[in-house]
Amino acid sequence: MQVRHFSSCRIVQAGKERFVPSSGTYPKGFKVGGFFTGVKKNAFNMDLAMLSSDKPCNAAAVFTTNVFKAAPVQVDRKILDVTQGKGIKTVVVNSGCANAVTGEGGIHDAQQMVKKADQVFGSESDLPASLVMSTGVIGQRLKIDKILKGIEEHAPAMKDDHEAWLNTAKGICTTDTFPKLMSQQFKIGDNTYTIAGLTKGAGMIHPRMATLLGFFATDAPVSASALGVALKHAADRSFNAISVDGDTSTNDTIVCLANGAAGGPEITETSASFPVFQDILTDFSSRLSQLVVRDGEGATKFVKISVNDAVSEQEAAKVAETVACSPLVKTALYGKDANWGRILCAVGYSGMQVEPTKTTVSFMPTDGSSELKLLVNGEPEQVDEARASEILDMEDLEIQINLGTGGGKNANFWTCDFSHEYVTINGDYRT
């Protein structure tokens, strides 16, 4: 049984340690930290995460499409509109309370967080320079006095080392069993840059961007408009291509800050270097978002759904999403049941252009061994049940679907299985 206390990543679950970095290289000019303020009951569980840049950043974000948008989502959208994504210095996140469906009082609380962060970390103009996020139980007001006090008291303790970044990742966790943090260096031309990203999520995960909370920071000099385009492109192929349970949160937000501290020419949408940066951000986002699936509530498997030879990338993505979100497919995976009829059923009701006599479905093992074909051009194969059982016993596996349209367009989607433990975790969420 996976024991998930509220914000359970203080003790990383056995087997998940390999996903937690022991070191990292982080972007210049940022200080971060994770702290306890009293929003959560247990003092060992951090509930405040802060990131601040020494100099103003260009910023972009993608938000939930749930109509019940949480207060911080509404506040952040207005801030990015009025600032046009320029002059942002700080991101403050509280965990333990979502500040969602909290009325005008919740909006006021989020605004108070912005004002306090601006007072503590400074603003270069009269416009707001801070963004805020919240995650936790919906429908409850923030313990705003504790949060405001925590922002002021803990700001001097923020640092730029690995431990500080890891604590920041811990500070945004709820039912996560491990903190999700990544960093990497990359080159564009003669310049070397660094990007760091952290995210949280294990349940209420489904693409409608964003699918969870997270933020990126880079010392590359990227314009605000270019950052927005690159982040949307990256999110559609990463955070919008994962699902744990099919539920889209009220609080979903991904923010990206670029402070340009590493120097070099500005990267704009028309720069020759822009496609390079966009590809780097997309790959980085994809790897980071997959950690959320690996930590899916009650999950025992990490599953990649690959759809090939569709008429368009959008149609391939929709077919992959439909299969990934099918409860019957997900429970069959948990039961190690090679019931490919459930996969085909989901493909058929995806609403996309599918020709049954051209469709092929296979299990692709991740150990390098040969694939197991289940259906070829609409004709069922004689499935080796023992071989199927071997593949389904693996933690990682791939379901490959070839639509045979001749269009040559592909898409990937990542999901996990549904277990008894998912019901237990969510049945006990508030207790």
Swiss-Prot record:
Sites marked Cleavage: A210, T211
Reaction(s) catalysed by this chain's protein: N(2)-acetyl-L-ornithine + L-glutamate = N-acetyl-L-glutamate + L-ornithine; L-glutamate + acetyl-CoA = N-acetyl-L-glutamate + CoA + H(+)
GO CC entries: mitochondrial matrix
GO biological process: L-arginine biosynthetic process; ornithine biosynthetic process
Predominant cellular place of this UniProt entry's protein: mitochondrion
Site (Involved in the stabilization of negative charge on the oxyanion by the formation of the oxyanion hole): T135, G136
S-S pairs: none
Alphabetical UniProt keywords: Acyltransferase, Amino-acid biosynthesis, Arginine biosynthesis, Autocatalytic cleavage, Mitochondrion, Multifunctional enzyme, Transferase
Residues binding substrate, per UniProt: T174, K200, T211, E297, N426, T431
One GO molecular-function entry: glutamate N-acetyltransferase activity
InterPro entries in the record: Arg_biosynth_ArgJ (IPR002813), ArgJ-like_dom_sf (IPR016117), ArgJ_beta_C (IPR042195)
Record's comment on post-translational modification: The alpha and beta chains are autoproteolytically processed from a single precursor protein within the mitochondrion.
Key word Cell inner membrane present: no
Catalytic-site annotation from UniProt: T211
Annotated family: Belongs to the ArgJ family.
Assembly behavior: Heterodimer of an alpha and a beta chain.
Biological role stated in the UniProt entry: Catalyzes two activities which are involved in the cyclic version of arginine biosynthesis: the synthesis of acetylglutamate from glutamate and acetyl-CoA, and of ornithine by transacetylation between acetylornithine and glutamate.
Name of protein: Arginine biosynthesis bifunctional protein ArgJ, mitochondrial
Provenance organism: Yarrowia lipolytica (strain CLIB 122 / E 150)
